[in-house]
């Protein structure tokens, strides 16, 4: 409450921090408080997210009546939407359709979520006073954050390091890369200790649904017994028809994937991002 925020963006919300909030509904309600800040002049909301209506209602109830701008990758009724979206391992391209006109955008950032975040950033910058025509010229020069869909090329294999540590984030990373893999799509991941235990088997199921082979490993156990974390990760999971390795030492798990991945394979190393 000590910040005089003028532009607020709602991108998305998925299961996380339930060890603190208790339920996803309570977590969403906490996020919605941002859009009631009376200092706000503009609110930018992703219509593609399932909680967007809650955020819209909060913004509309704001006595300061901030300007509400919406965006979407799929809905043409949004103020800003896109067409001709194409994904490549080198990034994405699309046509941005806005109140100011249509613009061709070439982004070097990999992944669906990066298209969403880029769109939100362009809208915020435009509202802050920059022309979209100028902004899109700088997009090809963007560099991704370390550990966020960070690509490491090795001969005919690809390794991707990402911070994904929720079921939804892991699904997004894997489905993005599945479009491009010609061999096997590997997932190396773990679950943090002293956090929401309920999402652990959901993480495993997400990996099994979208990758094969899968390596279960450690993330950051904090003060929790690592064995309990692995037990939770396997709770109620059917491992039939999947190649699954359980390697508790994260360094050894990564070494195993590097040693066994073949030409055409993509290996996702998820959970810790830039941390080493």
PLM feature spans:
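Short glycine/proline-enriched loop/turn "hinge" motifs that connect secondary-structure elements
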Residues: 2-3, 206
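Acidic, Mg2+-coordinating active-site environments of NTP-dependent enzymes
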Residues: 4-159, 234-236
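ATP-dependent carboxylate-amine ligase
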Residues: 65-67, 100, 110, 120-276
């Amino acid at each position: 409450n000590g910040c005089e925020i003028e532009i607020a963006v709602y991108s998305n919300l998925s299961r996380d921090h339930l060890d603190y909030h208790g339920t996803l509904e309570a977590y969403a309600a906490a996020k919605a408080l941002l859009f009631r800040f009376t200092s706000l002049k503009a609110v930018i909301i992703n219509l593609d997210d399932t909680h967007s209506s809650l955020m819209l209602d909060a913004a509309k109830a704001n006595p300061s009546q901030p300007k509400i701008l919406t965006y979407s990758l799929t809905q043409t009724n949004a103020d800003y939407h896109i067409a001709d979206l194409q994904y490549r391992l080198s990034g994405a391209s699309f046509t941005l359709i806005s109140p100011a006109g249509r613009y061709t955008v070439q982004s070097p950032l990999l992944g669906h979520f990066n298209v969403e975040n880029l769109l939100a950033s362009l809208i915020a910058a435009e509202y802050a006073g920059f022309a979209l025509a100028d902004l899109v010229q700088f997009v090809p020069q963007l560099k991704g954050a370390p550990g966020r869909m960070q690509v490491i090329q090795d001969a005919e294999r690809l390794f991707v390091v990402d911070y994904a540590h929720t079921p939804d984030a892991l699904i997004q990373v894997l489905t993005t890369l599945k479009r491009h893999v010609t061999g096997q799509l590997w997932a190396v991941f773990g679950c943090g200790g002293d956090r929401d235990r309920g999402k652990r088997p959901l993480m495993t199921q997400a990996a099994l649904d979208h990758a094969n082979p899968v390596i279960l490993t450690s993330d950051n156990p904090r003060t929790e017994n690592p064995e309990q974390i692995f037990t939770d990760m396997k709770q109620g999971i059917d491992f039939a028809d999947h190649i699954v390795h359980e390697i508790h030492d994260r360094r050894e798990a990564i070494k195993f994937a590097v040693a066994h991945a073949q030409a055409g394979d993509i290996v996702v190393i998820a959970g810790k991002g830039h941390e080493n």
